């Protein structure tokens, strides 16, 4: 009766020892990764600026800053997709002249100018406040002040 138990135990032990000797350890390898993204639907320039500010808040939890991946235009509004990318340790701050109107033609240009103004104001201990205007000829301008 004892030999009936010993034989299966011996075979199992031998199998485990051989498997341990012949196999090498493999660690999982990352084959793809992506940064967190957030998408906002908006109508108009003021909502785009608010979507950008919301993306800043969202990306802060990852110690990152938003980068515009794409802006899609549709019949029912526009959609902006932001990717959270690691914040640079050294940032070049472009000089923004407060209360000077900056013309822009595209949503991307508006976001770029807005981010530059925010960096400038933050470097000077404030926060950027934007005012968007559209002239009768359709020219769009944004003016910043630091508060």
PLM features: what roles do these ranges have?
Residues 1-11:
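Bacterial N-terminal signal peptides that target proteins for export
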Residues 17-20:
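C-terminal motif of bacterial Sec signal peptides marking the signal peptidase cleavage site
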Residues 22-25:
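Bacterial signal peptide processing site
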Residues 29-31, 139:
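A hydrophobic alpha-helical transmembrane-helix feature that marks the membrane cores
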Residues 48-147:
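Intrinsically disordered, glycine/charged-rich N-terminal periplasmic/extracytoplasmic linker segments
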């Amino acid at each position: 009766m004892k030999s009936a138990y010993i034989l299966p135990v011996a075979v199992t032990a031998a199998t485990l020892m051989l498997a341990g000797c012949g196999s090498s350890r493999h660690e999982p390898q990352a084959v793809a990764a992506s940064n967190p993204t957030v998408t906002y639907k908006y109508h108009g320039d003021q909502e785009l600026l608010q979507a950008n500010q919301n993306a800043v808040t969202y990306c802060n939890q990852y110690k990152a800053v938003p980068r515009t991946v794409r802006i899609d235009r549709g019949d029912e509004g526009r959609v902006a997709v932001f990717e959270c990318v690691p914040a640079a340790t050294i940032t070049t701050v472009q000089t923004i002249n407060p209360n000077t109107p900056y013309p822009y033609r595209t949503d991307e240009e508006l976001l770029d100018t807005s981010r530059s103004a925010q960096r400038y104001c933050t470097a000077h201990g404030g926060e950027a406040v934007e005012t968007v205007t559209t002239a009768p000829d359709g020219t769009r301008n944004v003016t910043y002040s630091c508060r």
